[in-house]
Curated annotation (Swiss-Prot):
SUPFAM superfamilies membership: Metalloproteases ('zincins'), catalytic domain
Compartments where found: Cytoplasm, Cytosol
Gene: CYOP
Organism phylogeny: Eukaryota, Viridiplantae, Streptophyta, Embryophyta, Tracheophyta
Name of protein: Probable cytosolic oligopeptidase A
Residues binding Zn(2+): H483, H487, E513
Length: 701
């Protein structure tokens, strides 16, 4: 047991305005989390003894317990994602079961559950605000889904399943991370990497230096290729060496599918336990459990996926035909038998020839500082907010991390956020994400203020600046920053003071991508894009004809790209509805079966993409991957409100932006998302704008 002295100085246990990211270390985790859980356990017992079906005697003390745990656990989990060390990983792994045990105990508290039911059944129910009613109903539903209504022996079985699932998903993502790190290909002959742009060669040389090849340079090598996205993608897009593309593709596709890092058995066990959990709760399959907290139903999700699939199939077949004839014209020996490691490469060549756009040549026009300035400028126009640097106000975990304050039109702070832009392959996980640090809350307000302001963190994995050259971005990375900022806006601009339903909390999962995907649409809006795209050396604006090509390129291979996402969504639903663990069909056979209708080029027999499908086995998207498409329908339709108003009519754009802010961004989880959408749009969502934006409308007509 840690001594009182060491506990009193443990940063995880202090009161703080902002998390002490700079002073938390692996050795703080075990004693800190254990002491915190002990403290929260005592508070929970106290609450259960004194609970009454009222806000002050139930919701407020409960929010304090939930908040403290989510803030502290969020802090160490965040550090694991951005500053991973074996020590931190081991410490978190050790205390994770204890934290899950406490969460289960909290989620299955009969006194709390009964008090919420009493509020639900009281004569005062109708006088509660909609947000408070949503909060109560969410707590009751969550309790039922966490096994509260089960008999003792069944509840014990349920809890074992939950513990085991937590462990398995944890192990799943570690295997993916380790398998990704494990692959290294050192290249000493420049001929082998012909076609790769200087930015990629620079990255490969940096990777080589970090592995002990001190003299490596972009020009002379050696170059180290890894499976991290900033390394993998350029190889698939630009390497003329077909054998290299094949080797890297096969390695990427078979990550975590063999040896000690094989995720196959883990996936089977996860699916088996999820099905058992569903049956215990009285559902037929796990997809029904997942949909219990979503806007959609299994049937509605299936229906949407099929509608989009049938609109995408013929265009996707045409895409492959176009690629084949283009490759043939270029004299490619493989033209008639294009396969997986050729598609990205030849698509990139076709895109360059058709739209004369080379992603790499566009990079100088998208420097990170300019992109952020334009993004903040857009947020001011649409939502009337100012984003101002506040570096130094809060501790950070790396010197590259920026800190910002969001102010309303009167200049009052309304939120804060961290931004961690660059890739650090040895310690930071791939991808981009937004997470909450604090949610807006009346109950958690410091003395002297009426509400605690929300704080978010945005994390990306862009190419770091090299020398005096700023971080230069691909257009896709620009879209990613806009996307994550959309999530952050919904977290930060909430007007909801009930902490448990503020911001992104309690928003149905399939509606949560609406603001993020909505923001991506602005990257194609001429004035917005032109305010971003300034050459970092000359200041020259992106030429008009290039903008037109970018716009046209938006629908390039839309059928194929749509099918790819539909494949992920469909295989996810199949595995969580029809698949029987231990039955006649293996997970890979399910994948192959789904692919018949969703992949024009059938997958390789040895395709093991499921082994690194972290979204559904380690990331909360189980039987929920369809929600990306569901939200694309919502976001395209929301953006079409601005198109209807007139994108060049600044007054109309501001008015529509204000309406978007007052509904979709402000109401948080305090109102059902369909109601919120109808309040903004004046009607229910339609898939038509999405198909129109993707150039697939004619195909579906």
């Amino acid at each position: 047991m840690a001594s009182e002295d060491t506990l009193s100085s443990n940063p995880l246990l202090q009161n703080f305005d902002f998390p002490p990211f700079d002073s938390v270390d692996a050795h703080h985790v075990r004693p800190g989390i254990r002491a915190l859980l002990q403290q929260l356990e005592a508070e929970l017992e106290q609450l259960e003894k004194a609970v009454e079906p009222s806000w002050p005697k139930l919701v407020e003390p409960l929010e304090k317990i939930i908040d403290r745990l989510s803030v502290v656990w969020g802090m160490i989990n965040h550090l694991k994602a951005v500053k991973d060390t074996p020590e931190l990983r081991a410490a978190i792994e050790e205390v994770q079961p204890e934290k899950v045990k406490f969460q289960l105990r909290l989620g299955q508290s009969k006194p709390i559950y009964n008090a919420f039911k009493a509020i639900r059944e009281s004569p005062d129910w109708n006088s509660l605000s909609e947000a408070r009613q949503r909060l109560v109903e969410a707590q009751i539903k969550e309790a039922v889904l966490s096994g509260i209504a089960l008999e003792d022996d069944k509840r014990e079985e349920f809890n074992k399943i939950e513990q085991e699932l937590e462990k398995l998903s944890h192990k799943f993502s570690e295997n993916v991370l380790d398998a990704t790190k494990k692959f290294e290909k050192l290249i000493t002959d420049k001929k082998e990497i012909e076609g790769l742009p200087p930015s990629a060669l620079g990255l490969f040389a940096q990777a080589a230096v970090s592995k002990g090849h001190e003299t490596a340079t972009a020009d002379t090598g050696p170059w180290l290729i890894t499976l991290d996205a900033p390394s993998y993608l350029p190889v698939m897009q630009h390497a003329k060496n077909r054998a290299l593309r094949e080797e890297v593709y096969r390695a990427y596709l078979s990550r975590a599918s063999s040896g000690d890092l094989d995720n196959t058995a883990i996936i089977d066990q996860i699916l088996k336990l999820r099905l058992e959990k569903a049956k215990l709760l009285g559902y037929r399959n796990y997809a029904e459990v997942s949909m219990a907290t979503k806007m959609a139903t299994v049937e509605k999700a299936d229906e949407l996926l099929e509608k989009l699939r049938s609109a995408s199939w013929d265009p996707a077949v045409q895409d492959i035909e176009d690629l084949k004839s283009f490759a043939k014209n270029q004299g490619a020996a493989e033209a008639d038998s294009l396969t997986h490691w050729d598609i990205t490469f030849w698509s990139e060549r076709l895109r360059e020839s058709k739209y004369d756009i080379n992603e790499e040549e566009l990079r100088p026009y998208f420097s990170l500082p300019k992109v952020m300035d334009a993004l903040f400028g857009l947020a001011k126009t649409l939502f009337g907010i100012d984003v101002v640097p506040a570096d130094g106000v809060a501790p950070v975990w790396n010197s590259d991390v920026r800190f910002y304050c969001v102010k309303d039109s009167s200049g009052n702070p309304t939120a804060y956020f961290y931004f961690d832009p660059y890739s650090r392959p040895s310690e930071k996980r791939d991808g981009a994400w937004m997470d909450e640090v604090f949610s807006r809350s009346r109950v958690m307000a410091q003395k002297g203020s009426s509400v605690r302001l929300p704080v978010a963190q945005m994390v990306c994995n862009q190419t770091p600046p090299v020398g005096d050259k700023p971080s230069l971005m691909t257009f896709r990375e620009v879209e990613t920053v806009f996307h994550e900022f959309g999530h952050a806006l919904q977290h930060m601009l909430t007007k909801e003071d009930e902490g448990l339903v503020a911001g992104i909390r309690n928003i149905e999962w399939d509606a949560v991508e609406l603001p993020s995907q909505f923001m991506e649409n602005w990257c194609y809006h001429r004035d917005t894009l032109m305010s971003i795209a300034k050459h970092y050396q000359t200041g020259e604006t992106l030429p008009e004809n290039v903008y037109k090509k970018l716009l046209a390129a938006r629908t390039f291979r839309a059928g194929s790209l749509s099918l790819r996402q539909l494949k992920f969504a469909t295989v996810d639903l199949e595995l969580h509805t029809k698949y029987m663990p231990g039955g006649a069909e293996t997970i890979y056979e399910v994948d192959q079966r789904v692919s018949i209708k969703t992949q024009v080029i059938p997958p390789l027999p040895e395709d093991r993409f499921l082994c690194s499908f972290s979204h559904i086995f380690a990331g909360g998207y189980a039987a929920g991957y369809y929600s990306y498409k569901w939200a694309e329908v919502l976001s395209a339709d929301a953006f079409s409100a601005f198109e209807d108003a007139g994108l060049d009519d600044i007054k109309a754009v501001k008015e529509t932006g204000q309406r978007f802010r007052n509904t979709i961004l402000a109401l948080g989880g305090g109102k059902a998302p369909l109601k919120v959408f109808v309040e903004f749009r004046g009607r229910e969502p339609s898939p038509e704008p999405l198909l129109r934006h993707n150039g697939l409308l004619a195909a579906s007509a």
